[in-house]
Amino acid sequence: MPSQDSDFPQKEHEKMTEFQEAVTFKDVAVVFTEEELGLLDSAQRKLYQDVMVENFRNLVSVGHVPFKADMVSQLETEEKLWTMERETQRNGHSSEIHSAVTSGSKIPNEMETLGKVMFKYLSCEELSCWQIWKHTTNDLTLQRKSSWFLHGDSLQVSEDENHIMNHKGDHFGCLENQEFLIPTAQASCGSRCLSESENPSRGKQMSVKNHLHVCEGFTKNSPLSDPGKTDAKQTPCKGERPHPCRVCGEGFSHGAVLPVHQVDPGEKCSHLQTHQRIHPGGTVNKCPKSGDGFHQNSFHPHHSNPTGEKSYRCDSCGKAFGSSTGLIIHYRTHTGEKPYRCEACGKCFSQSSNFQCHQRVHTEEKPYKCEECGKGFGWSVNLRVHQRVHRGEKPYKCEECGKGFTQAAHYHIHQRVHTGEKPYKCDVCGKGFSHNSPLICHRRVHTGEKPYRCEACGKGFTRNTDLHIHFRVHTGEKPYTCKECGKGFSQASNLQVHQNVHTGEKRFKCETCGKGFSQSSKLQTHQRVHTGEKPYRCDVCGKDFSYSSNLKLHQVIHTGEKPYTCEACGKGFSWRSNLHAHQRVHSGEKPYKCEACDKSFSQAIDFRVHQRVHTGEKPYKCGVCGKGFSQSSGLQSHQRVHTGEKPYKCDVCGKGFRYSSQFIYHQRGHTGEKPYKCEECGKGFGRSLNLRHHQRVHTGEKPHKCEECGKAFSLPSNLRVHLSVHTREKLFKCEDCGKGFSQSSRLQAHQRVHTGEKPYKCNICGKDFSHRSRLTYHQKVHTGKNL
């Protein structure tokens, strides 16, 4: 057969799943005699039972059934393996059933029919199993229910599935196509092994010479070692070694052996290693504690994996395993194979143990109970992790910040806080997350899904934790208490925010204006002042708002709802805050006090506006003339000067006003209302400002002084009139005649000359006058006072 060594490195991984070495039950079995079992206590018996059950399940999971169908259930009910062996020995099948236990073969009528056949052979050189397959059976496919036999130097496959024969000069016959390999007769020596991936197909022949694993103890007795039985084309002259190793220089008589020479010894065929244990006196394993040598089939409790050797290595990732079963299960991570499917939800698993644990999700079985709190768990590992909560154990420490964790998974997720890694991305908006569960919750923002419903009010939530927190609204539970003042909170985050009141800490700073905030959310909201962002829009009128709370307050305008009513006067309010502020009118409470002037205010907003009097702050600027104002309402009123807008109209005379305050004062002129009374003389006034000015007549106060001549005035308007004496400025011009006046009031009086208006009438004789001073002079005629 032509050599294909050149193809070997490139295609090494292409058929690894096909070349997986066969797993014998002997590789993983733990066998005790009846006397040895009698030395075990109950805990050791339970451990032995668990190990054997898992071994059987693992073999079943990869398609190997080297036992009766009910053996797993027998093991689970603590029936003993040695009992089954002893009963079989009485029936005359001692050697065969021992092989079934240790090697994984079977006996007719005792074991179920298996799927494939493997044999052990003898050869003079060693090759790993999958290399034999590579060199001999590239195009061969194993057919089920075929029989094999050794014929000379060739391995032939018979079509007769019941055919079993022994050849002259050979110590081996053939069995029905099986998955596990045993000799069919007791030979003195010369066992040859061929793994699962080496089986040729029906009707084909393959040369087995130089392609089989050899037991060094039997090489001399091999019929293949006779040069007369070898092919001249393949066998070099005696002593000749034409194939040297490039690394160490050692020569080999066959080129096919060279690649195996370069393979790590731990990767040699497992069947050869297993076979070597049957030689008398052979002690493959040695206990480092006691020094005892033992075969795997004479395992003692303290001899479990004594050397810690992991001879089964994955060619894909290099990971090593102590048994071939573990390697087979591991290899499914590369192939993606998941043979165990849940009938309830369709989820698939690569291991039977994980599948069995998953089924408890549907059955809600929780067999593992915590002795401390009684909490149940579906998996024992979850119970062990939970018990760390009671012990306060946190074995996983972060080297960056020293924070401890009870679970390794939580520790790994936490490390992403320091690394900034966010491997989980949202497909819709691209937002990243450090672990999977927040991504699942985030996706519900896009889908609108709210799977968690409150049974009390029907409100939906995207996260289960939000539902638990919300439910405290109904129960009134406040588990988080401030140690400083004893105030309770339903959420831990609210407690953390509250504690900033005591510490005064404001960790979150605005990079634009430097203002500090105790919460990051408040900083984010504040930044909209600088960006002008208004993400919340009213569906009714289209108005935008920077805050969701402002939108909710605004929407009450459209509904007209006033759910908050004052118990003292019955007045209704749309917002609770307005009700609280109104109630201070009745109580007289003014909790906001100015430290500069000791003035008090009932509302916080009035207090903040007042403070600008002392600071001189005028944050609201007119875009037309640049004039500044301390309040936004002042800016809005001022802008009407430029637009000429007068939205407030008098129903009596039709006069318009820019400001609501001016309109209110004007209406009192028609009604005669004068609510502000002087306590000294009883005179009434329509405006509080006029009362304050009048009181200066009694006090003699003249706060407005002329800087030119030092003359003082009680009113600022009088000072402005006086200043025109020094400047001789006449700003107010008559459009009819061009005459100038220093005061607007004098211009208005002058314009009556042109209009003929006489608004002042005598109540006694009905005579009209254009000026108030002239009416006053006329009234003295009727009173008889000296003119």
Curated annotation (Swiss-Prot):
From which organism does this entry originate? Bos taurus
| Predominant location category | nucleus
What's a BP term from Gene Ontology annotated to this protein?
regulation of transcription by RNA polymerase II
Give the family from UniProt. Belongs to the krueppel C2H2-type zinc-finger protein family.
The residues covered by the KRAB domain are 23-94
Keyword terms of this UniProt record: DNA-binding, Metal-binding, Nucleus, Repeat, Transcription, Transcription regulation, Zinc, Zinc-finger
| Full protein name | Zinc finger protein 227
This molecule's function is given as: May be involved in transcriptional regulation.
The record ties this protein, via Gene3D superfamilies, to: 6.10.140.140, Classic Zinc Finger
**Zn finger (C2H2-type) start-end:** 243-275, 312-334, 340-362, 368-390, 396-418, 424-446, 452-474, 480-502, 508-530, 536-558, 564-586, 592-614, 620-642, 648-670, 676-698, 704-726, 732-754, 760-782
GO MF term set: DNA binding; zinc ion binding
Q: Which GO terms describe its cellular component?
A: nucleus
* Record-linked SUPFAM superfamilies: beta-beta-alpha zinc fingers, KRAB domain (Kruppel-associated box)
Record-linked PANTHER family: GASTRULA ZINC FINGER PROTEIN XLCGF26.1-LIKE-RELATED, ZINC FINGER AND BTB DOMAIN-CONTAINING
Q: Name the domain of life this protein comes from.
A: Eukaryota
Where does it reside?
A: Nucleus
